[in-house]
């Protein structure tokens, strides 16, 4: 498990421009991530996803996020997420640790 505080910094630097995490947070360029863990791809209510995201059919968890966040366009070809990814495993683990707490129902 990663470091939550480091993960929060990574979120602010690399994710917060397009995503919110709090319950009832608005969608930006990307969807609000509240309730992310255990949800299938392309399922945040009220967000317009590509067919690629809707049809991927995986459930978000530590393992799927670890793979996705390394290279989003490789993991879901056709996603509109323009983020290049986080190459360092430790940074991805930190971000996931933060997301696990910040997006919890």
From Swiss-Prot:
One of its GO terms (molecular function) is metal ion binding. The modification Phosphotyrosine is found at residues 49, 98. The modification N6-succinyllysine is found at residues 56, 73. The modification N6-acetyllysine is found at residues 73, 100. SUPFAM superfamilies: Cytochrome c. The modification N-acetylglycine is found at residue 2. InterPro entries: Cyt_c-like_dom, Cyt_c-like_dom_sf, Cyt_c_1A/1B. Its main location: mitochondrion. One of its GO terms (biological process) is apoptotic process. Binds 1 heme c group covalently per subunit. Phosphorylation at Tyr-49 and Tyr-98 both reduce by half the turnover in the reaction with cytochrome c oxidase, down-regulating mitochondrial respiration. Gene3D superfamilies: Cytochrome c-like domain (1.10.760.10). Heme c binds at residues 15, 18-19, 81. Keywords: Acetylation, Apoptosis, Electron transport, Heme, Iron, Metal-binding, Mitochondrion, Phosphoprotein, Respiratory chain, Transport. It is found in: Mitochondrion intermembrane space. One of its GO terms (cellular component) is cytosol. Pfam families: Cytochrom_C. Belongs to the cytochrome c family. Electron carrier protein. The oxidized form of the cytochrome c heme group can accept an electron from the heme group of the cytochrome c1 subunit of cytochrome reductase. Cytochrome c then transfers this electron to the cytochrome oxidase complex, the final protein carrier in the mitochondrial electron-transport chain. Plays a role in apoptosis. Suppression of the anti-apoptotic members or activation of the pro-apoptotic members of the Bcl-2 family leads to altered mitochondrial membrane permeability resulting in release of cytochrome c into the cytosol. Binding of cytochrome c to Apaf-1 triggers the activation of caspase-9, which then accelerates apoptosis by activating other caspases. This is Cytochrome c. It comes from Mirounga leonina.
């Amino acid at each position: 498990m990663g470091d939550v505080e480091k993960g929060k910094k990574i979120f602010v630097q690399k994710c917060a421009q397009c995503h919110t995490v709090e319950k009832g947070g608005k969608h930006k360029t990307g969807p609000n991530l509240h309730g992310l863990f255990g949800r299938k791809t392309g399922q945040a209510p009220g967000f317009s996803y590509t067919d690629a995201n809707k049809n991927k059919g995986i459930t978000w968890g530590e393992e799927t996020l670890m793979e996705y966040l390394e290279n989003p366009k490789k993991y879901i070809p056709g996603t509109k997420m323009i983020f290049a990814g986080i190459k360092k495993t430790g940074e991805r683990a930190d971000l996931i640790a933060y997301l696990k707490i910040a997006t919890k129902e």
